[in-house]
Amino acid sequence: MKRGNKLIGALVAVAVVASACGGTGSGGSTAGTSTATATPTASAVTRPDVIVGSTNFYEQITLGELYSQILEANGYKVTRKFNLGNREIVEPAIESGQIDVDAEYLATLLAFVDKNGTISKPTTDPRATQIGLQKALDPKGLTVLDYAAATDQNGFVVTQATASSKSLKKLSDLAPIGNTLVLGGPPECPQRPFCQLGLKNTYGITFKDFKPLDSGGPLTIAALDGKQIDVGLLFTSDPSIVAKNFVLLDDDKHLQLADNIAPVVRNALLNKDDGTLARLLDSIGAKLTQAELNDMNKQVAVDKADSKAVAAAWLKKQGLIK
């Protein structure tokens, strides 16, 4: 989904489950475990055709290329249906069989498919959120595979100079000095449980001031660059983190809901396969760190590199294709 919609979802729509997400999880530092199993196969095995879809922004297209290329390298015929639109278009497409595979975000997808939280609610623990998401996907004939350490969720960043001068690596480092710092973010941030309010309640951080800006966009980036703010709200996979050498502070007390990246696959496709498809897609998640995702996003969004070439280079670097 587009970044603007994603931030609004994180700050507003998902806020209704905040009371159920009180930092009891293990965070997003380790990859998840799906129920899919892999079976070694001979090269002569006939592979099912696969349609890989994506929403309409660069990160999704790159993830779609990662999935497509690793499958193609292992004998699958892949059709790409990228740039389909937002989740309101893509989710019905995978449920109806117009596409077979797409990259998703655990907490956001769970909040979307189970809007009232009657089956499960997103939490700050990726494994618990994955389990809840699978329960919500079961009636739809879909399976969520292993999640990556990489996320696309709210994050708080500082400049390299600020991080070095104040020894900042994680959000809890802000607590003793928060009253000397200015926070920047969307105007609603002071009242939101995953923004300034959450930083106060979870970390005990009280800032000297708050500067209303935009939803993780150019105003926040410019304010950080121009030293108008000390801490800014961006997405954890924002390409400016690499391009500007910002430091993403670790959410060490797990304030944010677990929006780890994971492939979602139609069961009808998995049932035609021998486990190889799930194993191949899971191998991507096992190596996709936050730094690796952010670097690819920077190459595509800032350097204007081709998503297909960026994905191929990453897969080769990781030893996943030749």
Regions found by a protein language model. Give the residues of each.
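A conserved helix-loop-strand patch within extracytoplasmic ligand-binding domains
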Residues: 123-183, 267, 286-290
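Beta->alpha turn/N-cap motifs
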Residues: 86-87, 97-110, 129-130, 159, ...
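Bacterial lipoprotein signal-peptidase II cleavage site
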Residues: 18-35
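An extracytoplasmic/periplasmic, membrane-proximal ligand-sensing/linker region
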Residues: 59, 192, 200, 205, ...
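Bilobed "Venus flytrap"/periplasmic-binding protein-like clamshell domains
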Residues: 47-79, 84, 149-221, 305-309
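Alpha-to-beta junction loops
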Residues: 95-104, 178-181, 220-234
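Ligand-binding "clamshell"
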Residues: 113-123, 130-145, 228, 240-254
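Periplasmic-binding protein-like
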Residues: 141-142, 148-152, 214, 237-284
